[in-house]
Swiss-Prot record:
It comes from Oryza sativa subsp. japonica. It is an enzyme of class 3 (hydrolase). This is Aminopeptidase M1-D. It comes from the Eukaryota. The keyword Repeat does not apply.
Length: 873
């Protein structure tokens, strides 16, 4: 019989001859012993003749003697660990229709932040455990046997047996609670149909604060005891988000309550469990006195993102992980829409270009993937929770909304939510609704954007009074691919408002007479004539202008004739084109010089990112010029940094508060002596007397300044930072310290910092910050450490997302083909499915950097360009 059961091995998905309709679960977590036990009673609908029931189970001990279906014991029970399936084979065919499957099981409350796991916290000086679930993507099977795929939606009725002094939360409100000595039994209301990955449980000691929506839904934020005040901002954003989404989707929030809980140990930023959203503490808690402006904004964006999922993802769920972007792309886009409504002064849609830039960078790799990516095994799923599913997904949604118009787009989304509520949908289902409501050929337009990897670069050439456009796939390795997309083109001529809009459906297109009103003399006059494609960067593509148009745009930028978004697009496109060898670094430096008077947060953030990239590559590409290039960038950033200063002003804007640390950290990383000295001075005053103020927005710059001077023989600053880390109870403060610990050249200090992540003092989810802070001068030290400790790393940090971060952080510091070959050889026998994609992408980035180094070395005019611009500044 086992041979027959084996036919279900190696399948991407479970067979559909039986499906769950209702789960009744009773779970007993033992927080002291870190184990749990449970019983499941599942109403199963058998829809086709079979003698098998096939479901998922992993890391569970299922009591085989307890298994019954309609009173029948299976003749054979097979567990296939690699496939994470449990196959029950019965002696004869099962009766068609609904029957009940019952079983008992037990497992471990693991420390891997997945499935049913334990998280540590401090209470009255004692370390305690809380029990937490994290089931997305495929880890509900680690808590109870189930049909662990999004399309197997069912109702859930949960009962928990927990220590009587603890708070026990689940998706639904409590309907009954009985205390019997040290144990209480908590029974929850039955849920509407939902996917297994959205089931949630949290058990621990908590305080909470409460609000209520316009519909009367209770919203609570749960925190560690004594921290409830830090949940007020998230609560306010949460209530406002539910109210806004109810109106936007024309559909009420589907559940009676919503709880949001801060979890100390948490792999992801947050998880949108239906009615019980869990967060890493840094993404839910905000303290007016000790939190930075960036933390405040991150909390708002994260809360708005997770609550958008209550409609896009929970009420309407993707049919399979291939359509993950329907969850994550829309939640990302909706979060910006919500935050823009709540805080218009944050100019959040301009900041959205951070997401677009991240997606464009990843999607210009040959090792990227389409938005809709085929999933053949559960181990592949986690690797697509990346910038493609989130940021490219959100960016193409923004592009489509721009093309259809906001009103039609909103109406279509509301129709989509209503049509597929309490069920599942594929990407094609969304396109069909959008076509029906808008009357536009949405599927034809969007299919290449979701099913095809990559995106185009649009070449723009001026031919007399006409403009010629040509599209090719853009790849950072400089190779060409004649990929074709239907591209929504927006074009401005001499004005942001003078736009042409059309679809580029072919490789080539001509725009006739666009500049016929300008004679040759006008065109030669600086700033009199310019053309900008992709107005406000609503399209997901890059643009390469010919030399004449490049010069004209540079002049327009210098004369402040472009919108903030257009400035960002021009700078980011030029940076990418330089890396790909399609434009010179000299051309990019001239463009950055044209931005010398810029003072906007978003634009300067992108400029700072580009200058950091160029400064790093110059160390390998042109070491004799690296110092001068840094001085050039210091001169570019310094005027605005000096105007802002180190101390916040009472009346300053949120964006100025965000800009200050960007510039100060940038100047420290570029080695600006005056900024470093001031950072060290302020740190010393703060360290000597903690009652002195070191504003949260400037702490990272001060800490980084201290690390600049640290060495094995001068480690007082390093020890002071570790003391702050150990004494602080504020999450943001501890993360600030971790994020700079490896930022020095001294080999011994770097190794001490890297080994620090193996101690109990660093939570697993935070360890990547130490690796990310390694500087180029210490990359060989870090690489040797990674090789020597790889087995320990994979054992300690099993989550594939964490391993991916480790690999990317260190591998991408290198810029030679020889190093790429060495790294590739090391990992040849050490890959795991969960981080294989991240490794391939990291190695590709090394090859791209090596090619960029070669290109820069071949630029004869670069030294003269740097000298000339230094004199001008």
């Amino acid at each position: 019989m086992a041979a027959a059961a084996a036919e279900f091995r190696g399948q991407a998905r479970l067979p559909r001859f039986a499906a769950p309709r209702r789960y009744e679960l009773r779970l007993r977590p033992d927080l002291a012993a870190c184990v749990f036990s449970g019983e499941a009673s599942v109403a199963v609908d058998v829809s086709a003749p079979t003698r098998f029931l096939v479901l998922n189970a992993a890391d569970l001990a299922v009591d085989r003697a307890s298994i019954r279906f309609q009173g029948l014991a299976p003749a054979e029970v097979s567990v296939f660990e690699e496939d994470e399936i449990l196959v029950l084979e019965f002696a004869g065919e099962l009766p068609l229709g609904e029957g009940v499957l019952a079983m008992r099981f037990n497992g471990t409350l693991n420390d891997q932040m997945r499935g049913f796991y334990r998280s540590k916290y401090e209470y009255k000086g004692e370390t305690k455990n809380m029990a937490v679930t994290q089931f997305e993507s495929v880890d509900a099977r680690r808590c109870f046997p189930c049909w662990d795929e999004p399309s197997f939606k069912a109702k859930f009725k949960l009962t928990l047996e927990v220590p009587s002094e603890l708070v026990a939360l689940s998706n639904m409100p409590i309907v009954n609670e009985k205390i019997a000595g040290p144990i209480k039994t908590v029974e929850y209301e039955e849920s509407p149909v939902m996917s297994t990955y959205l089931v949630a449980i949290v058990v621990g000691l908590f305080d909470y604060i409460e609000g209520v929506t316009s519909e009367g839904n209770k919203v609570r934020v749960y925190t560690q005891v004594g921290k409830s005040n830090q949940g007020k901002f998230a609560l306010d954003v949460g209530v406002k988000s539910l109210n806004l989404y109810k109106e936007f989707f024309d559909t009420p929030y589907p559940l009676p309550k919503l709880d949001m809980v801060a979890i100390p140990d948490f792999t992801n930023g947050a998880m949108e469990n239906y009615g019980l959203v869990t967060y890493r503490e840094i993404y839910l808690l905000f303290d007016e006195q000790s939190s930075s402006a960036s933390t405040k904004q991150n909390v708002a964006i994260t809360v708005a993102h997770e609550l958008a999922h209550q409609w896009f993802g929970n009420l309407v769920t993707m049919e399979w992980w291939t359509h993950l972007w329907l969850n994550e792309g829309f939640a990302t886009w909706m979060s910006y829409l919500a935050v823009d409504s709540f805080f218009p002064e944050w100019n959040i849609w301009t900041q959205f270009l951070d997401s677009t830039t991240s997606a464009l960078k990843l999607d210009s790799l040959a090792e990227s993937h389409p938005i809709e990516v085929e999933i053949h095994h559960a181990s592949e799923i986690d690797s697509i929770f990346d910038s493609i599913s989130y940021d490219k997904g959100a960016s193409v949604i923004r592009m489509l909304q721009s093309y259809l118009g906001a009103e039609r787009f909103q109406k279509a989304l509301a129709s989509y939510i209503k049509k597929y509520a309490y069920s599942n949908a594929k990407t094609e289902d969304l396109w069909a609704v959008l076509e029906e409501v808008s009357g536009e050929p949405v599927k034809n337009l969007m299919t290449t954007w979701t099913k095809k990897q990559g995106y185009p670069v649009i070449g723009v050439k001026l031919k007399g009074h006409d403009v010629e456009l040509e599209q090719d796939q853009f790849l950072l390795d400089g190779s060409s691919d004649s990929g074709m997309w239907i591209v929504p083109i927006t074009l401005g001529c001499n004005s942001h408002d003078m736009q042409k809009r059309f679809l580029l459906k072919h490789k080539f297109s001509d725009i006739k007479g666009i500049n016929s009103q300008y004679d040759d003399q006008d065109r030669q006059n600086s700033g009199n004539f310019w053309i900008k494609l992709n107005i406000d960067e609503t399209g997901f593509y890059r643009v390469k202008y010919d030399d004449e148009l490049t010069t004209a745009l540079r002049n327009a930028l210098q004369m402040k004739k472009l919108s903030l978004m257009d400035k960002i697009g021009i700078v980011e496109d030029a940076h990418a084109l330089s890396i790909a060898g399609k434009q010179t670094l000299s051309s990019l430096l001239h463009l950055l010089y044209a931005c010398r008077d810029e003072d906007d947060f978003s634009v300067l953030s992108h400029i700072n990112s580009v200058t950091s990239s160029v400064a790093k590559i110059s160390i390998d590409a042109t070491p004799e010029l690296a110092g001068e290039i840094k001085q050039l960038f210091i001169k570019l950033l310094l005027p605005t940094a000096e105007k802002l200063g180190w101390d916040p002003k009472n009346s300053e804007s949120h964006l100025d508060a965000m800009l200050r640390p960007v510039l100060l950290v940038g100047l420290v990383q570029l080695g600006h002596d005056k900024t470093i000295s001031e950072g060290v001075r302020r740190f010393q005053i703060f360290f000597d007397d903690r009652n002195t103020s070191l504003p949260p927005d400037t702490r990272k710059a001060a800490y980084l300044s201290v690390m600049h001077n640290v060495s094995s023989t001068n480690r007082s600053g390093y020890d002071a930072l570790l003391k702050i880390y150990r004494e602080s109870t504020e999450v943001e403060e501890r993360l600030n310290v971790l994020g700079i610990l490896s930022s020095c050249q001294d080999k011994d200090i770097v190794l001490e910092s890297l080994n620090f992540i193996f101690t109990d003092e660093v939570r697993n989810q935070d360890a990547y910050l130490v690796l990310r802070s390694v500087i180029i001068d210490a990359r060989e030290t870090a690489w040797s450490w990674l090789k020597e400790n790889w087995d320990r790393i994979t054992k300690t940090f099993a989550a594939s997302a964490i391993l991916s971060d480790y690999v990317k952080s260190i591998v991408t510091l290198f810029t030679s083909k020889e190093k790429e070959a060495e790294i590739s050889q090391f990992f040849a026998t050490r890959t795991k499915p969960g981080f294989k994609r991240a490794l391939k992408q990291s190695l590709e980035n090394v090859r791209i950097s090596a090619r960029w180094v070669d290109g820069i070395r071949g630029e004869a005019e670069l030294a003269q360009t740097v000298h000339d611009l230094l004199i001008k500044l």
